[in-house]
C-alpha cells in the first residue's frame, strides 16, 4: 500500500489529445498509456477500451469522454480523449476536462485539416495555455521534405492563433508502431520523447489554494449579535480572519473585513479552496449582499457587463432549443450561483445560430458579474439549459 501513497505526492497535470478526425488521437492515447506503463508502471490501455468512451454530463450536456491516467518519473497525468468532434467542442467549452496542456495530433500524410484549425482556435478561446504537437503516421511518409512542409504549416497555424509556433515542440512518430512495440525511431522512442516534452514544456499548474481568494456567495444570513454571514464553497485561495475582502458583482464593489470563518458549526482561523464555509462580514448589512456576488481578495477580480464568449448551443436531442436564435436574443446567463439576463450580439456575417452549433458572440448583461477570461457559464431559458459558454475576453 505504501506505493500508492507515494504516487499521490507527484504533481498532477491534466492533458488531452486534440486534432482532426482520424489523425490518430485515440491510438496515440493508447500508445502513451502503454509506453508509460512500461517505463513508470501503471496500467496499459488498448485502443478499444479508450474508444468506447462513456457518457458523462457537464452543465446539463452529455459528453462522451475517455479518461486515462499515467505516470512519468516526475509527474502524474490525467489524460482526456474524445471520440467525436462535437464532444471536443462541448468538452472544451464546458470545461468538463480542464487542460493544463494539449497534445495536438496531426497526420503527416494529410497535414493540418479544418478541425486542426478549429481545435487550436478553441484552445485559444477557452484558455488552454500550452500545446505540444505529435506528427503522427510519419512511418508511411517516404519524403523527408514533406514532413518538413507539414511541420512548417503546423507552426504557422499555431502562430496564427497566438501560440508560439516557432518554439512549440513537434515530435515525429507513429502511434500505431509504438502500440505494436516497435523500437524504431517513430515507434516507442517517439512516445518516450513526447512524455519528456510534456514533463519539460508544460509547467506545473498553479494549485487552486495558491491563487487569489474567491468564494461565490450562495446564501446570506443575519445572526443576531454577530452580524452577516455569507456561505459558499471557496473556489480558490484562502480567507483568513482579520483580512480585508471585497464583495464584487451585481452592485458597486464594497470592502469589508472577515471577522470569522465557520465550517460544520466550528469556528476556524481560515477557509481554504474546496471547503464549504460561512464567512462573517464586519459592518455589512444583510440587504447589502446577495447570491450571485463573490467574496474576493481586494483588486483580484472586477465586475463586467460586456464580454466575448465561445458558446456551444445544445441540439434539440440534447434538450436544447428546437429553433435557431437571432441577433439580440435575450436569455439568462448562469454564472457560478445565479442567472443574469443578457443580450447576444452575433458576429458580422452570422445571421442566426442553429441548435448544435458552436459560435463566437458578444454579450451584454443587465447587471455586472465578477468575471475573468476562462469563466464558464450556462445559457438558460426558463430554467432549462440551452447552451454552455466560456468567457474569451472581457470589456471594461
Swiss-Prot record:
<keyword id="KW-0963">Cytoplasm</keyword>
<keyword id="KW-0342">GTP-binding</keyword>
<keyword id="KW-0479">Metal-binding</keyword>
<feature type="binding site">
    <location>
        <position position="26"/>
    </location>
    <ligand>
        <name>Mg(2+)</name>
    </ligand>
</feature>
<dbReference type="InterPro" id="IPR027417">
    <property type="entry name" value="P-loop_NTPase"/>
</dbReference>
<dbReference type="Pfam" id="PF03143">
    <property type="entry name" value="GTP_EFTU_D3"/>
</dbReference>
<feature type="region of interest" description="G4">
    <location>
        <begin position="136"/>
        <end position="139"/>
    </location>
</feature>
<dbReference type="InterPro" id="IPR005225">
    <property type="entry name" value="Small_GTP-bd"/>
</dbReference>
<dbReference type="GO" id="GO:0003746">
    <property type="term" value="F:translation elongation factor activity"/>
</dbReference>
<dbReference type="InterPro" id="IPR041709">
    <property type="entry name" value="EF-Tu_GTP-bd"/>
</dbReference>
<feature type="region of interest" description="G1">
    <location>
        <begin position="19"/>
        <end position="26"/>
    </location>
</feature>
<dbReference type="InterPro" id="IPR009001">
    <property type="entry name" value="Transl_elong_EF1A/Init_IF2_C"/>
</dbReference>
<feature type="region of interest" description="G3">
    <location>
        <begin position="81"/>
        <end position="84"/>
    </location>
</feature>
<dbReference type="GO" id="GO:0003924">
    <property type="term" value="F:GTPase activity"/>
</dbReference>
<keyword id="KW-0547">Nucleotide-binding</keyword>
<feature type="domain" description="tr-type G">
    <location>
        <begin position="10"/>
        <end position="206"/>
    </location>
</feature>
<comment type="similarity">
    <text>Belongs to the TRAFAC class translation factor GTPase superfamily. Classic translation factor GTPase family. EF-Tu/EF-1A subfamily.</text>
</comment>
<keyword id="KW-0378">Hydrolase</keyword>
<feature type="binding site">
    <location>
        <begin position="136"/>
        <end position="139"/>
    </location>
    <ligand>
        <name>GTP</name>
    </ligand>
</feature>
<dbReference type="Pfam" id="PF00009">
    <property type="entry name" value="GTP_EFTU"/>
</dbReference>
<dbReference type="InterPro" id="IPR004541">
    <property type="entry name" value="Transl_elong_EFTu/EF1A_bac/org"/>
</dbReference>
<dbReference type="InterPro" id="IPR009000">
    <property type="entry name" value="Transl_B-barrel_sf"/>
</dbReference>
<dbReference type="Pfam" id="PF03144">
    <property type="entry name" value="GTP_EFTU_D2"/>
</dbReference>
<feature type="region of interest" description="G5">
    <location>
        <begin position="174"/>
        <end position="176"/>
    </location>
</feature>
<dbReference type="GO" id="GO:0005525">
    <property type="term" value="F:GTP binding"/>
</dbReference>
<protein>
    <recommendedName>
        <fullName>Elongation factor Tu</fullName>
        <ecNumber>3.6.5.3</ecNumber>
    </recommendedName>
</protein>
<keyword id="KW-0251">Elongation factor</keyword>
<feature type="region of interest" description="G2">
    <location>
        <begin position="60"/>
        <end position="64"/>
    </location>
</feature>
<keyword id="KW-0460">Magnesium</keyword>
<dbReference type="InterPro" id="IPR000795">
    <property type="entry name" value="T_Tr_GTP-bd_dom"/>
</dbReference>
<dbReference type="GO" id="GO:0097216">
    <property type="term" value="F:guanosine tetraphosphate binding"/>
</dbReference>
<dbReference type="InterPro" id="IPR050055">
    <property type="entry name" value="EF-Tu_GTPase"/>
</dbReference>
<dbReference type="InterPro" id="IPR031157">
    <property type="entry name" value="G_TR_CS"/>
</dbReference>
<dbReference type="InterPro" id="IPR004161">
    <property type="entry name" value="EFTu-like_2"/>
</dbReference>
<feature type="binding site">
    <location>
        <begin position="81"/>
        <end position="85"/>
    </location>
    <ligand>
        <name>GTP</name>
    </ligand>
</feature>
<comment type="subunit">
    <text>Monomer.</text>
</comment>
<dbReference type="InterPro" id="IPR004160">
    <property type="entry name" value="Transl_elong_EFTu/EF1A_C"/>
</dbReference>
<dbReference type="InterPro" id="IPR033720">
    <property type="entry name" value="EFTU_2"/>
</dbReference>
<keyword id="KW-0648">Protein biosynthesis</keyword>
<feature type="binding site">
    <location>
        <begin position="19"/>
        <end position="26"/>
    </location>
    <ligand>
        <name>GTP</name>
    </ligand>
</feature>
<comment type="function">
    <text>GTP hydrolase that promotes the GTP-dependent binding of aminoacyl-tRNA to the A-site of ribosomes during protein biosynthesis.</text>
</comment>
<dbReference type="GO" id="GO:0005829">
    <property type="term" value="C:cytosol"/>
</dbReference>
Amino acid at each position: 500500500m505504501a506505493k500508492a501513497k507515494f504516487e499521490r505526492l507527484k504533481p498532477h497535470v491534466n492533458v488531452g489529445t486534440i486534432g482532426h478526425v482520424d489523425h490518430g488521437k485515440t491510438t496515440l492515447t493508447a500508445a502513451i498509456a502503454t509506453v508509460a506503463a512500461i517505463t513508470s508502471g501503471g496500467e496499459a490501455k488498448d485502443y478499444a477500451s479508450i474508444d468506447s468512451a462513456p457518457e458523462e454530463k457537464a452543465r446539463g450536456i452529455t459528453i462522451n469522454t475517455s479518461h486515462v491516467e499515467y505516470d512519468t518519473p516526475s509527474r502524474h497525468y490525467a489524460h482526456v480523449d474524445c471520440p467525436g468532434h462535437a464532444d471536443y467542442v462541448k468538452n472544451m467549452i464546458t470545461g468538463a476536462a480542464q487542460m493544463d496542456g494539449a497534445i495536438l495530433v496531426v497526420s503527416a500524410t494529410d497535414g493540418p485539416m479544418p478541425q486542426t484549425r478549429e481545435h487550436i482556435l478553441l484552445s485559444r478561446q477557452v484558455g488552454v495555455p500550452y500545446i505540444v504537437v505529435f506528427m503522427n503516421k510519419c512511418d508511411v511518409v517516404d519524403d523527408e521534405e514533406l514532413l518538413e512542409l507539414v511541420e512548417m504549416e503546423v507552426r504557422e497555424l499555431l502562430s496564427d492563433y497566438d501560440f508560439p509556433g516557432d518554439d512549440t515542440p513537434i515530435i515525429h512518430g507513429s502511434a500505431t508502431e509504438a502500440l505494436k512495440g516497435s523500437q524504431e525511431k517513430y515507434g516507442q522512442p517517439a512516445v518516450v520523447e513526447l512524455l519528456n516534452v510534456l514533463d519539460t514544456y508544460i509547467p506545473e499548474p498553479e494549485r487552486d489554494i495558491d491563487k487569489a481568494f474567491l468564494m461565490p456567495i450562495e446564501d446570506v444570513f443575519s445572526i443576531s449579535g454577530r452580524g452577516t454571514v455569507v456561505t459558499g464553497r471557496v473556489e480558490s485561495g484562502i480567507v483568513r480572519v482579520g483580512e480585508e475582502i471585497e464583495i464584487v458583482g451585481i452592485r458597486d464593489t464594497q470592502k469589508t473585513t472577515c471577522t470569522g470563518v465557520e465550517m460544520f458549526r466550528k469556528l476556524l482561523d481560515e477557509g481554504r479552496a474546496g471547503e464549504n464555509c460561512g464567512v462573517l462580514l464586519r459592518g455589512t448589512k444583510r440587504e447589502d449582499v446577495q447570491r450571485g456576488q463573490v467574496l474576493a481578495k481586494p483588486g483580484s477580480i472586477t465586475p463586467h457587463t460586456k464580454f466575448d464568449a465561445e458558446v456551444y448551443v445544445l441540439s434539440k436531442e440534447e434538450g436544447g432549443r428546437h429553433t435557431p436564435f437571432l441577433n439580440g436574443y435575450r436569455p439568462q446567463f448562469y454564472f457560478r450561483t445565479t442567472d443574469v439576463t443578457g443580450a447576444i450580439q452575433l458576429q458580422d456575417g452570422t445571421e442566426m445560430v442553429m441548435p448544435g452549433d458552436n459560435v463566437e458572440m458578444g454579450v451584454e448583461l443587465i447587471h455586472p458579474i465578477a468575471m475573468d477570461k476562462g469563466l464558464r457559464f450556462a445559457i438558460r431559458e426558463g430554467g432549462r439549459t440551452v447552451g454552455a459558454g466560456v468567457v474569451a475576453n472581457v470589456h471594461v
